[in-house]
């Protein structure tokens, strides 16, 4: 776009009729990412594990798994609700995500504690459902809907004593994905991984269409943990100058 504008600016004084447009900028992202602190994580999942619903008795055994997948695997809520029985390998802990934002399936891995919890969940529920049915279900046997989980999320925040600010400040369900990404960058940095090596790895794992969305998470990580930026030096300023990012 800039090269074209310069060319038109050159033509205009030569007598050519051209139209010069103002620079087009992407609209700002109005949502403010919330990073769940260690204390908030502990309180939130304590509330999840003690959540009961007379409306759907499955909630007490499926919500601890569902919300931990969001936090521990960094999945989007739509991808998580789209998990079917056949998508989970309870031996390896690998989950196949098929209902993704960009239509490309990918894989995430459950760690030891989450995998143990998922196995207990499977022991109690998988015998009731076919391979192609959703694992997170409503009381009628259909897949859970986003609006239901959104409502439960608000209830859990209240139980945990975590204020819901609203007005694009959350904390939202999607902020578990933000928290996963930031913690992943921090963990890799602490283990000596160069951030420019970590960037494409995490971008692929998160299923981003381009690396720009992942760069946004790296920017947030550097803001929260300045010591990482000090390791990176002045290169970070060159990389992040003027970057706009896509939905994540």
Task: List PLM regions with ranges.
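C-terminal catalytic core of Y-nucleophile DNA break-rejoin enzymes
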Residues: 102-119, 132-154, 166-173
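Flexible interdomain linker/hinge and immediately adjacent N-terminus
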Residues: 16-48, 98, 138-140
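Basic, Lys/Arg- and aromatic-enriched nucleic-acid-binding interface segment
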Residues: 46-77
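C-terminal secondary-structure termini that scaffold catalytic or DNA-interacting sites
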Residues: 232-248
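Conserved tyrosine-mediated DNA breakage-rejoining catalytic core shared by Y-recombinases
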Residues: 73, 78, 82-116
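Non-catalytic DNA-binding core/recognition domains of DNA-processing enzymes
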Residues: 1-13, 22, 110
């Amino acid at each position: 776009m800039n090269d074209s504008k310069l060319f038109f600016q050159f033509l205009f004084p030569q007598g050519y009729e051209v139209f010069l447009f103002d620079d087009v900028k992407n609209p700002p992202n109005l949502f403010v990412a919330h990073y769940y602190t260690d204390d908030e994580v502990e309180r939130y999942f304590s509330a999840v594990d003690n959540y009961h619903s007379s409306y759907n008795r499955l909630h007490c055994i499926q919500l601890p798994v569902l919300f931990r997948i969001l936090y521990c695997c960094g999945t989007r809520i739509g991808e998580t609700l789209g998990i079917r029985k056949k998508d989970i390998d309870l031996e390896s802990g690998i989950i196949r995500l098929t209902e993704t934002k960009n239509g490309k399936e990918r894989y995430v891995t459950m760690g030891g504690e989450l995998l143990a919890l998922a196995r207990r969940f499977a022991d109690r529920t998988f015998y009731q459902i076919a391979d192609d049915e959703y694992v997170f279900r409503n009381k009628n046997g259909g897949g859970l809907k986003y609006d239901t989980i959104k409502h439960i999320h608000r209830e859990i925040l209240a139980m945990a004593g975590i204020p819901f600010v609203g007005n694009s400040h959350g904390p939202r369900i999607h902020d578990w994905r933000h928290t996963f990404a930031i913690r992943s960058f921090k963990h890799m940095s602490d283990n000596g991984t160069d951030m420019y090596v970590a960037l494409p790895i995490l971008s692929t794992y998160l299923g981003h269409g381009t690396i720009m969305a992942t760069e946004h998470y790296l920017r947030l990580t550097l803001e929260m943990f300045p010591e990482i930026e000090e390791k990176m030096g002045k290169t970070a300023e060159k990389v992040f100058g003027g970057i706009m990012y896509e939905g994540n």
